[in-house]
UniProtKB/Swiss-Prot annotation:
PANTHER family: DEFECT AT LOW TEMPERATURE PROTEIN 1 (PTHR40021:SF1). Belongs to the DLT1 family. The chain crosses the membrane at residues 16-36, 48-68. This is Defect at low temperature protein 1. Its main location: membrane. It is found in: Membrane. InterPro entries: DLT1. The gene is DLT1. Residues 1-15, 69-342 are cytoplasmic. It comes from Saccharomyces cerevisiae (strain ATCC 204508 / S288c). Disruption phenotype: Sensitivity to 6-azauracil (6AU) and mycophenolic acid (MPA).
Length: 342
């Protein structure tokens, strides 16, 4: 600020101070003189009432003006954008203050760039971290910001509302059965495999710890839980219960070729041929059973009501003549261009 500008500022402040002193002095003299003159008059009570009433009206009027000015000033401040920073001389005449504002803005920019990527990995329990906060050498197994607890809860929701446990539709359970009861009935009861028994107990303990401990799920717990699900899912797929009633039929090598022609259906839910992709939109979610392939032949035959294989009292098929007889029965049965959904 130049010398002439400083002189103007000092003259303005001095004149304002003198004017305020004179205004206050004359304002104080007037009510005092009015009260003194009223007290000397003959009608003291009436004159005093008039003077005091005038002073009260004047005071109320002054208060009204001051409050109105404050409200007007506040409304003017609201019109200023909140993100506006006063960096111009008209907004902030003090030069040092403007320079401090500009320096802090530059520092904030540097800190933003510096802290955008943390120095060390930041991993919080319960949520999959983004790639920029994760360990750079670890393989990214799950999507970013995946909620571990929601994924685990969906397993019990599918069991509770859909009767589906690890993609196994053959779940015999009661309404009061818990997750542990289902695991015990599927993999513990009547099971002599020590490895499966041990893993089933660990699976139950891990699930109950995650669901009822009240703590966030760690990444290690979630990875271990997913491994257990994959393991027991594979174990469930090896248990084919659809032909349990036909265990008495021991087919030899020639009879195994019955009905094994190239089919237009596949049990691979991730089949990527054009026919499978065309039919995928019919399913609300990836199918867990059979998907069409490119062939137009039949993969299975529907046995009519006249042919009862499950309750057959015949002896097991050991000779070629028995196999030929069975093939003749199947050829006379009704045929469908469909599959048996397991």
């Amino acid at each position: 600020m130049s010398g002439f500008a400083k002189l103007k500022s000092w003259l303005y402040k001095a004149s304002l101070f003198v004017s305020l002193i004179l205004l206050i002095g004359f304002s104080v003299v007037l009510p005092i003189d009015s009260i003194a003159q009223a007290s000397k008059s003959e009608n003291n009570a009436f004159n005093t009432f008039i003077v005091v009433g005038a002073l009260v009206v004047f005071g109320v009027f002054c208060i009204f003006i001051i409050i109105g000015r404050m409200l007007f000033h506040k409304s003017c401040l609201k019109d200023i954008p909140r993100r506006y920073i006063p960096i111009t001389p008209a907004d902030l005449p003090h030069r040092s203050s403007r320079e401090a504002v500009l320096q802090n803005m530059e520092r904030s920019k540097e800190l933003t760039i510096l802290l955008k990527k943390p120095k060390d990995p930041v991993i919080h329990d319960g949520l999959e971290p983004p790639r920029r906060c994760d360990y750079p050498l670890d393989e990214k197994l799950f999507p970013e910001y995946l909620n571990y607890a929601d994924c685990i809860k969906s397993l019990t929701d599918r069991l509770k509302y859909h009767g589906l446990f690890l993609n196994n539709l053959d779940v015999r359970m009661n309404l009061e059965d818990t997750f542990a009861d289902v695991v015990n009935s599927q993999f513990v009861n009547h099971n002599a495999n020590k490895i499966q028994l041990e893993k089933a107990k660990e699976f139950i303990d891990l699930y109950e710890t995650i669901r009822f401990s009240g703590k966030d799920v760690t990444r290690d717990q979630f990875i271990k839980f997913v491994k257990f699900c994959l393991y027991f899912g594979e174990v469930s797929l090896t248990r084919d219960t659809s032909f349990a009633n036909l265990h008495n039929f021991r087919l030899n090598g020639s009879s195994n070729n019955i009905g094994r022609t190239e089919s237009k259906y596949s049990i691979n839910p991730f089949d990527e041929n054009e026919y499978a992709q065309d039919d995928m939109h019919y399913f609300p979610e990836p199918p867990t059973h059979l998907v069409r392939e490119s062939s137009i032949s039949t993969v299975a035959r529907h046995v009519s009501s006249g042919v009862d294989l499950t309750n057959s009292e015949e002896h097991p098929l050991d000779t070629d003549s028995d196999c030929n007889a069975l093939r003749l029965k199947l050829s006379k049965a009704d045929s469908y261009r469909s599959v048996i959904r397991h």
